[in-house]
Amino acid sequence: DRDSCVDKSKCGKYGYYGQCDECCKKAGDRAGICEYYKCKCNP
């Protein structure tokens, strides 16, 4: 939901960029790794 996409905490799980959900992808990536986004990574 929209609120999860503005959550500024670190991702609940670390993983590859391809494993992040769509709103994470829209927020960008860090060296191809889902490390810090404005929403959580997929499990």
Swiss-Prot record:
<keyword id="KW-0960">Knottin</keyword>
<keyword id="KW-0964">Secreted</keyword>
<comment type="similarity">
    <text>Belongs to the ergtoxin family. Gamma-KTx 4 subfamily.</text>
</comment>
<keyword id="KW-0800">Toxin</keyword>
<dbReference type="GO" id="GO:0005576">
    <property type="term" value="C:extracellular region"/>
</dbReference>
<protein>
    <recommendedName>
        <fullName>Potassium channel toxin gamma-KTx 4.3</fullName>
    </recommendedName>
</protein>
<dbReference type="GO" id="GO:0019870">
    <property type="term" value="F:potassium channel inhibitor activity"/>
</dbReference>
<keyword id="KW-0632">Potassium channel impairing toxin</keyword>
<dbReference type="Pfam" id="PF08086">
    <property type="entry name" value="Toxin_17"/>
</dbReference>
<keyword id="KW-1015">Disulfide bond</keyword>
<feature type="disulfide bond">
    <location>
        <begin position="5"/>
        <end position="23"/>
    </location>
</feature>
<feature type="disulfide bond">
    <location>
        <begin position="11"/>
        <end position="34"/>
    </location>
</feature>
<keyword id="KW-0528">Neurotoxin</keyword>
<comment type="function">
    <text>Reversibly blocks Kv11/ERG potassium channels.</text>
</comment>
<keyword id="KW-0872">Ion channel impairing toxin</keyword>
<dbReference type="GO" id="GO:0090729">
    <property type="term" value="F:toxin activity"/>
</dbReference>
<feature type="disulfide bond">
    <location>
        <begin position="20"/>
        <end position="39"/>
    </location>
</feature>
<dbReference type="InterPro" id="IPR036574">
    <property type="entry name" value="Scorpion_toxin-like_sf"/>
</dbReference>
<dbReference type="InterPro" id="IPR012622">
    <property type="entry name" value="Ergtoxin"/>
</dbReference>
<feature type="disulfide bond">
    <location>
        <begin position="24"/>
        <end position="41"/>
    </location>
</feature>
<keyword id="KW-1220">Voltage-gated potassium channel impairing toxin</keyword>
